[in-house]
Amino acid sequence: MRVLWVALVVTLLAGCRTEDEPGPPPEVHVWWEESKWQGSQPWEQALGRFWDYLRWVQSLSDQVQEELLSTKVTQELTELIEESMKEVKAYREELEAQLGPVTQETQARLSKELQAAQARVGADMEDVRNRLVLYRSEVHNMLGQTTEELRSRLASHLRNVRKRLVRDTEDLQKRLAVYQAGLREGAERSVSALRERLGPLVEQGRLRAATLSTRAGQPLRERAEAWGQKLRGRLEEMGSRTRDRLDEMRDELEEVRTKVEEQGSQLRLQAEAFQARLKGWFEPLVEDMRRQWAGLVERMQSAVSISSSTSAPSDNQ
């Protein structure tokens, strides 16, 4: 269970009765005040979580007291302290980064004071945690004995620590607010002074630029026109060369086409002559083969006729 040690502190400060001295329920006295560190800055919100953490423990029941000897409480408090100090340090570094408009001596003094205030707040929170650790050890050693005196001493010390922590936290908050206001005022003065110094220079620069523009406008236009004419002449020259080259390429292509047509005609004539020669070679062979084939067919027909005549008398017998 979270933050059980702080619950024990709350129970003690509430004046819980001991086992040996029963009596009416005492009035609960909260040793911390309502969370007042609910500002817009992250470090103020971190301190607010620390106070809310303690106030939440007050709502725990008495059944958790037997579990309060765990070290979980000190771990939780350590995390809250580290978170608070981290946020305070980040905000302090942010303010130091904004100390540009002030002198180096003032910047060093402000940084030193902020570090001292931060250290005091951190020491107060560490004191609360250390007192809880010490009380845990003493309670562990005094189990079965009366702890009324120990509770009274712890409650008194925690009240003193609470007052000191509240005072140091308020001091840190006031210092940060004063330094932030001073930084804003210094930055505004620096910006105003810079604007006053740069105003005449900007006006002079504007007038000089306008004068130079007026003086340089005419030569620039003349140079631009001359350059444009030169560019047009070069483009026309390149266009003429391109047209001449295209005409030459067209003539060369026409000449190549004529040569190709002549070579095609020659190839057709050569092919026709070769075809005629082949025809002259193969026609006698084809005619000879036709005569031989006709003779062969005629002999076969004669043989078939003779065979038919011979087989007919045999059938009659």
Swiss-Prot record:
One of its GO terms (biological process) is melanosome organization. Residues 209-289 are annotated as: Lipid-binding and lipoprotein association. Its main location: secreted. Keywords: Chylomicron, Endosome, Extracellular matrix, Glycoprotein, HDL, Heparin-binding, Lipid transport, Lipid-binding, Oxidation, Repeat, Secreted, Signal, Transport, VLDL. Residues 79-254 are annotated as: 8 X 22 AA approximate tandem repeats. The lineage of its organism: Eukaryota, Metazoa, Chordata, Craniata, Vertebrata. This is Apolipoprotein E. The keyword Plastid does not apply. Residues 157-167 are annotated as: LDL and other lipoprotein receptors binding. Sequence repeats lie at residues 79-100, 101-122, 123-144, 145-166, 167-188, 189-210, 211-232, 233-254. Belongs to the apolipoprotein A1/A4/E family. It comes from Sus scrofa. APOE is an apolipoprotein, a protein associating with lipid particles, that mainly functions in lipoprotein-mediated lipid transport between organs via the plasma and interstitial fluids. APOE is a core component of plasma lipoproteins and is involved in their production, conversion and clearance. Apolipoproteins are amphipathic molecules that interact both with lipids of the lipoprotein particle core and the aqueous environment of the plasma. APOE exists as multiple glycosylated and sialylated glycoforms within cells and in plasma. The extent of glycosylation and sialylation are tissue and context specific. Glycated in plasma VLDL. Residues 1-18 form the signal peptide. Disulfide bonds: none annotated. The gene is APOE. Homotetramer. May interact with ABCA1; functionally associated with ABCA1 in the biogenesis of HDLs. May interact with APP/A4 amyloid-beta peptide; the interaction is extremely stable in vitro but its physiological significance is unclear. May interact with MAPT. May interact with MAP2. In the cerebrospinal fluid, interacts with secreted SORL1. Interacts with PMEL; this allows the loading of PMEL luminal fragment on ILVs to induce fibril nucleation. It is found in: Secreted; Secreted, Extracellular space; Secreted, Extracellular space, Extracellular matrix; Extracellular vesicle. InterPro entries: ApoA_E, Apolipoprotein_A1/A4/E. GO terms for molecular function: amyloid-beta binding; cholesterol transfer activity; heparan sulfate proteoglycan binding; heparin binding; identical protein binding; low-density lipoprotein particle receptor binding; phosphatidylcholine-sterol O-acyltransferase activator activity; phospholipid binding. Residues 277-289 are annotated as: Specificity for association with VLDL.
